[in-house]
Structures are given as structure tokens and as C-alpha cells.
Curated annotation (Swiss-Prot):
InterPro entries: RNaseA, RNaseA-like_dom_sf, RNaseA_AS, RNaseA_domain. The lineage of its organism: Eukaryota, Metazoa, Chordata, Craniata, Vertebrata. This is Brain ribonuclease. Keywords: Disulfide bond, Endonuclease, Glycoprotein, Hydrolase, Nuclease, Secreted. It is an enzyme of class 3 (hydrolase). It holds the Pfam family RnaseA. Belongs to the pancreatic ribonuclease family. It comes from the Eukaryota. CDD domains: RNase_A_canonical. PROSITE patterns: RNASE_PANCREATIC. It comes from Ovis aries (Sheep). GO terms for molecular function: endonuclease activity; nucleic acid binding; RNA nuclease activity.
Amino acid sequence: KESAAAKFRRQHMDSGSSSSGNSNYCNLMMKRRRMTHGRCKPVNTFVHESLDDVKAVCSQKNITCKNGQPNCYQSNSTMNITDCRETGGSKYPNCAYKTSQKQKYITVACEGNPYVPVHFDGAVLLPATPLPSLPPPHKRRLL
């Protein structure tokens, strides 16, 4: 079975390339990376940075994930990404996508040992406020 880390790489990593000037990028990549099997995945983001740079986000700014979990991290700098969004006329099995290239801060959820990205949580133009660093539980005083 595909691990969560491998699935993240398949769905979100496209190092060493970019979608610039290629409006067909998402149509090709969504198919190539098996996100149009059984249904059209409505929205997906590809990151055009090195895997090491994206893995490094797991030690950057700790923020809360959209689902409320505390294991999300935002990149310290913007990254070159491509947003793929299903178009209105898209109908399975003929999935159709709009390609938009952007520079944004990315947020990923990390887990495991080694601690690696397993979920792409979003991308924003402005950096978030990090969670306060709490001392380890045994050093916390009751307020």
C-alpha cells in the first residue's frame, strides 16, 4: 500500500519543472499522477521546489491545520506552486482543469519518523502567526 509520504510526493511534488506558459499542465499532470481515477479530484496543488526544501517545512513555522490538528507547518518563504482547479465543464472521465501558477507560503501536515509531509493543507499569500511554543508538559504551571 502507498504510504502517506509517498502519496504526498505523488500528488504534490513536481520539482525541477514549472507550469509557466503551459495551460495544459494540470490536465496532463492530474492524469499522470492518478488523480483522475474513478473520479476527478476537484482541487490539487503541485509544488515546484526540491523535496528537501518541502521536507524542511516540517521544522519551520508550527500552525494549526484546517481540521484543528496541531501538526501543520508553514514555509518560511514563498514557494513556486501550481494550483489545479476543476473547470465547470469537467465531467468524469474527461476531467478538465484550470492551471494557475503562484508564489505562496505553503502549509503541510507532517508526521512519522523521519518527520515528513503527509498532507498539503493549503497555500497563502501572507504568512500566518505561529502557535506559541509551549514548554514540555512537566514544566507547565497551572495558570
